[in-house]
Amino acid sequence: MRSLQNSIVLLAVLVLAVLPVAAAAQPGYVALGDSVDFGIGSSTGAGWVVPFNGFLSSPSVFNAPVELLNLAVPGAETKDVDQDQLAAAVAAASAHSPVVVSLGGGGNDLRHFIVSPAAHACLKVQSCLARLNALLNEAEQRVDLALKKLREAAPNATILVRTQYNPLRGTGCAAPDLVALGDASLEAPPSSAIKGGGLNWRLRAAAARQGAKVIELFLPFAFFGDSALVGDCIHPNDFGYSLIVLQAVTAFTAP
């Protein structure tokens, strides 16, 4: 009887030895967005996404190499993120565990509106405010859809939503009325003439609906001003990108 038991155990060991072993899913980080997430303005091209990925790979977080997929495209609007980046992001997010996803967007949607000739008097013209509200509504809906699909693909993912700063605050970048419009378009509360609030309010609301965390950028960039921007009135410099990394780490580690 003992001989039979030993034979069965040996057979089981041999069977297990030849069975394919499922590879453990590798930690992953998927970034969607525009030129800020791509890293334009960084002297090394690393921007904020690459050093943040280094943080995720560190012993204090995943303690393992984290596979990075940066899908961000310079100039992308929210519609471009949904059309050109989302499908690949969903596939990558579902293939990694644990996984972190960051989503940036909306800045180009607003920038193209704010630099238009009609924008100078926008805060005083109801028809212009109506167009701005419509633009913000569309951006919010697209971000909401993207976050919903990402959450469905990776229910346990840590999702980060990057809010926008106002680059027009840089010296010589815009007339005061356009700087004010930029601020309002981003941070006007829902009770203001911009119904539903500025873009960042909407991004925070969309994040809350999908259990995502928020990378807050408006106040840090407003505080440091020119020190955080390159000379193109759009992108961060190396110091600006370090601010984004800091805010991303803060958001990631928040309860």
Segments the model singles out, each with a brief description of its role:
Residues 1-10:
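Bacterial N-terminal signal peptides that target proteins for export
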Residues 24-74, 101:
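Serine-esterase "nucleophile elbow" of acetyl-processing enzymes
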Residues 164-255:
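Catalytic His-Asp segment of secreted/periplasmic serine-dependent ester chemistry enzymes
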